[in-house]
Amino acid sequence: MKDVGSLTEAEAANELMRLAKQIAHHNKLYHAEDSPEISDADYDALVRRNTAIEEAFPHLIRADSPNRLVGAAVEASPLAKVTHAQRMMSLDNAFAAEDVEEFAARVRRFLNLDEGEPLAFTAEDKIDGLSCSLRYEKGVLVQAATRGDGTVGEDVTPNVRTIADIPQNLKGDIPDIFEIRGEVYMAKADFAALNARLLAEADDPDKARQFANPRNAAAGSLRQKDASVTASRPLRFLAHGWGEVSALPADTQYAVMKAIESWGVPVSPLLKRCDGVADLLDHYRMIEAERAELPYDIDGVVYKVDRLDWQARLGFVARAPRWAIAHKFPAERAQTTLEAIDIQVGRTGKLTPVGRLTPVTVGGVVVSNVTLHNRDEIARLGVRPGDRIIVQRAGDVIPQVVENLTRDEPREPYVFPDHCPVCGSEAVAEDGEVDVRCTGGLICNAQKFERLRHFVSRGALDIEGLGEKSIAEFLELGWLEKGPADIFRLKSHREELLAREGWKERSVDNLLAAIEAKRQPDAARLLFGLGIRHVGAVTARDLLKGIGDIARLPGKAAELRAWVEANPRIEGESEGKYAARRLEAIKAILDVRADGIGPAVAEALGDFFHEPHNRVLWDDLLSEVSPPPYVVETRDSEVSGKTVVFTGKLETMSRDEAKAQAEALGAKAAGSVSAKTDLVVAGPGAGSKLKQAASLGIRVIDEAEWAAIVAAAG
């Protein structure tokens, strides 16, 4: 990796683009999916590299810079969205005593304080949990929300009401409005007991749900659609701050936290008021020494300026307050032997290498497995079975390999598989991506359940009565072995189904009727239901607007693949010119003009239909269903040819219905606001998109005005 000072402007721009994409990917995994794949230390290193490049090239700072963003968007969450009255911020990090000293010096410079003037802070342990905001009105809990992207989170009010640590009513003299913010977490002992219980309750111990660590367990338990699941999990809460308030009970951070504690909400027992940096560092060392004995996982100590009037003067940078910083703990390390490398296949087909280790204790925890992330990471480390390695456990979460001590020893290099170990399908990596994915899709047992669940979901075929439990049952019985086409053959198992526990004649017949009603499905929904990478609901509609008949899709996919093979980049042709030439060919072959269809979609289609298993699956499916040709009837309207964005809660129609209306009026329904947007339709709770539209001078209307436009088009 080049030193930042030696980067050219073009290299800096390219690296910032790569880092923005990479950090956003890891933010989504950590905050939205509760399945991080790199350690805190590796994540922090990416952010530090991004910050260093931005400081050297400030004119190259991107709109999607990680330093401007908090958490991850909750677009895909099944939970209702909540717009925070006051943004939930992140924290900047310190990794050494010098960083803490510089933080204090920055505060002094900003406030114009003399060196001898007292500067007090609070210090408390940084719990590794899920951030949550509790809104109390007149002392009564009325809403709870996750952080999400800092602006919009998920509504988890029913779930939070089941957590014993969180009072439904505060006691004492409470301001009319007071949002308490803190961490939902799971204690180490409770985490171990939960995994043991899930194992004991499982019919098949090999298939028992097991959480990787307490943070994942806490996040997965809180973000449930069914609050009774949350109630069965041992969740706890510690407050560390506040959001919107109508009044404050004191004028210092420490005093307000003590007031919150007096109202009945737990705060950290390690919270302390510190006079100066030396006192902060003493408290940090004390907490670090006791870390292994604490009942919960922590990954550092948070320092905050104590005086609230000084906090107000210091204010915020893009994603974090100037008056607070998180002092992270160094990673803990140990030596061991890499015994084997296994490949796990995830629900999206991603092949993840997992290192099997001679068990070793790292930071008080026995580690026997470690993620190796991807084939590039294996190549970078040069690891092979038999190597002696150093394992690091950073942030009390994910163990990782940081060094191969025997890479120079002569031994055959590890060869990453080019076929799926589960189903034998080709495993490929798309251009510009490090992840290798199985192309088997629905014929791959590792992916089959999730793909079938997606196929029958509301956005796809929307088969009522065919939920997760039924799909799992039918898969176990072998009734869905060939993929989605077998759904339409379930009627042949009617008598067997009636004989099974939990199935009555009415429920069986209702399910079979719902399936039969989808024999002529909307072609775009059918295509979306296949779960082809990069082919979402909007892309599926855009594709079918061009090709019309879905039966033509495999042929078009073959044309796309053939064009790439027959048209390599010409010597002397710039990458940009080749990309433009390829994009033009893609749009000509598919007869589309939509912005969202380009090389990624073309490559995904080509890979999917090139796989023989998928062609068999496709032909089998079309033998059971007959989607009519896809025809988009458009009407003349004032939005014809324009780009429309819907944001906020729509009260008279679903988001899908609104997008369909826009397309019927000849408009394009986009998911994000940009300079190309012509109109924004905003419902209650509209947040960042509405602000962006205002800053760009884009026309904004409400749902009633949109209904008038639709009505006027006839």
From Swiss-Prot:
Family annotation (Pfam families): BRCT (PF00533), DNA_ligase_aden (PF01653), DNA_ligase_OB (PF03120), DNA_ligase_ZBD (PF03119)
Assigned keywords, A-Z: DNA damage, DNA repair, DNA replication, Ligase, Magnesium, Manganese, Metal-binding, NAD, Zinc
Domain BRCT residues, every copy: 634-714
UniProt-listed InterPro entries: BRCT_dom, BRCT_dom_sf, DNA_ligase, DNA_ligase_AS, DNA_ligase_CS, DNAligase_adenylation, DNAligase_N, NA-bd_OB-fold
Binding site for Zn(2+): C420, C423, C438, C444
Keyword GTP-binding attached: no
Recorded GO CC terms: cytosol
Entry's Gene Ontology BP terms: DNA repair; DNA replication
Residues at which NAD(+) binds: D40, A41, D42, Y43, D44, S90, L91, E124, R147, E183, K304, K328
Family matches, as SMART domains: BRCT, LIGANc
GO molecular function ontology, one term from the record: metal ion binding
Cofactor: Mg(2+); Mn(2+)
Catalytic activity: NAD(+) + (deoxyribonucleotide)n-3'-hydroxyl + 5'-phospho-(deoxyribonucleotide)m = (deoxyribonucleotide)n+m + AMP + beta-nicotinamide D-nucleotide
DNA repair in keyword set: yes
Known EC number: 6.5.1.2
Active-site residues annotated for this sequence: K126
Stated role: DNA ligase that catalyzes the formation of phosphodiester linkages between 5'-phosphoryl and 3'-hydroxyl groups in double-stranded DNA using NAD as a coenzyme and as the energy source for the reaction. It is essential for DNA replication and repair of damaged DNA.
Family affiliation: Belongs to the NAD-dependent DNA ligase family. LigA subfamily.
PANTHER family noted in UniProt: CHROMOSOME TRANSMISSION FIDELITY FACTOR 18 (PTHR23389), DNA LIGASE (PTHR23389:SF9)
Name assigned to this protein: DNA ligase
Record organism: Sphingopyxis alaskensis (strain DSM 13593 / LMG 18877 / RB2256)
Taxonomy of the source species: Bacteria, Pseudomonadati, Pseudomonadota, Alphaproteobacteria, Sphingomonadales
The encoding gene: ligA
